[in-house]
């Protein structure tokens, strides 16, 4: 039996960093949003563990969240099963788009089905939380208000948004960005509540005005290109532009599709990754 799953990326429409926890993580408040950029993963029963990927820089050990999810399930349920996994990578690495977390979420769903585990929703959420902070969101997808370290999720009614994603030639360590935040003395902008109110009204201009990311302040200080991309997107007609996650990907929100397409063509030769995307209401899709 073979299973193919689309694992969708996410953007942070807001990200408030509230405090550092005793366990080393940070308390956050964030509106997380699934987008239609996706990796595709094939899973097949096997006697041994085989992992293939069409991107040579994807790690194959425990630092790969697919393998972390695989081992978490095997260890939790004392299993000795093998698996063959093929990953077709479309979400850029270390980009703030939760590509690794989305792949891990797909792995949890796939192993549940292939190994007939009949996991409850609560069990899946526990495994997801153990694997990574963004994995619980990627398991559910859509539009969510995330709190705790990102694993506590509350449903929100989303709004269709047209986005242009731009990733400069950088790969940024999430851990390093949070360390820089801790050392910066910055306080959270606390933008999430205003954003949620705008979302409830369905007012696109107010939504765009309240898109914000605390971590952008430390990342853009170190990497000027973040501000350059934001400025360029605004000049080309975006209602707003913001970094997602710990970066370095920046997205612009457009309400004029012609301007969006023009901006895509203008920027695609300038930066290594530029993609048109839109918001969706799911994190995973079985093909």
From Swiss-Prot:
InterPro entries per the UniProt record, alphabetical: GHMP_kinase_C_dom (IPR013750), GHMP_kinase_C_sf (IPR036554), GHMP_kinase_N_dom (IPR006204), IspE (IPR004424), Ribosomal_Su5_D2-typ_SF (IPR020568), Ribsml_uS5_D2-typ_fold_subgr (IPR014721)
Family: Belongs to the GHMP kinase family. IspE subfamily.
Pathways per UniProt: Isoprenoid biosynthesis; isopentenyl diphosphate biosynthesis via DXP pathway; isopentenyl diphosphate from 1-deoxy-D-xylulose 5-phosphate: step 3/6
Family matches, as Gene3D superfamilies: 3.30.230.10, GHMP kinase, C-terminal domain (3.30.70.890)
Name of the protein described by the UniProt record: 4-diphosphocytidyl-2-C-methyl-D-erythritol kinase
Function: Catalyzes the phosphorylation of the position 2 hydroxy group of 4-diphosphocytidyl-2C-methyl-D-erythritol.
Organism: Caldanaerobacter subterraneus subsp. tengcongensis (strain DSM 15242 / JCM 11007 / NBRC 100824 / MB4) (Thermoanaerobacter tengcongensis)
Keywords: ATP-binding, Isoprene biosynthesis, Kinase, Nucleotide-binding, Transferase
Entry EC number(s): 2.7.1.148
């Amino acid at each position: 039996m073979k299973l193919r799953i689309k694992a969708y990326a996410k953007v942070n429409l807001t990200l408030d960093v509230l405090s550092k926890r005793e366990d080393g993580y940070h308390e956050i408040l964030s509106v997380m949003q699934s987008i239609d950029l996706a990796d595709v993963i094939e899973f097949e029963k096997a006697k041994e563990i085989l992992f293939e990927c069409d991107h040579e820089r994807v790690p194959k050990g425990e630092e790969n969240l697919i393998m972390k999810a695989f081992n978490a399930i095997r260890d939790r349920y004392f299993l000795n099963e093998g698996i063959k996994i093929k990953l077709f990578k479309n979400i850029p690495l270390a980009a703030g788009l939760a590509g690794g977390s989305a792949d891990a979420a797909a792995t949890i769903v796939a192993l549940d089905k292939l190994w007939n585990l009949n996991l409850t929703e609560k069990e899946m959420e526990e495994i997801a939380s153990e694997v990574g902070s963004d994995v619980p969101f990627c398991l559910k997808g859509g539009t969510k208000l995330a709190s705790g370290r990102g694993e506590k999720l509350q449903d929100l009614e989303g709004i269709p948004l047209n986005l242009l994603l731009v990733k400069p030639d950088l790969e940024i360590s999430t851990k390093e960005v949070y360390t820089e935040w801790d050392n910066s003395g910055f306080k959270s902008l606390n933008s999430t509540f205003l954003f949620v109110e705008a979302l409830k009204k369905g007012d696109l201009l107010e939504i765009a005005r309240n898109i914000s990311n605390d971590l952008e302040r430390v990342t853009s200080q170190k990497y000027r290109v973040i501000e350059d991309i934001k400025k360029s997107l605004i000049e080309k007609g975006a209602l707003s532009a913001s970094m997602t996650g710990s970066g370095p990907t920046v997205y612009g929100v457009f309400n004029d599709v012609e301007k969006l397409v023009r901006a895509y063509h203008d920027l695609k030769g300038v930066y290594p990754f530029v993609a048109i995307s839109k918001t969706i209401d799911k994190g995973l899709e079985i093909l």
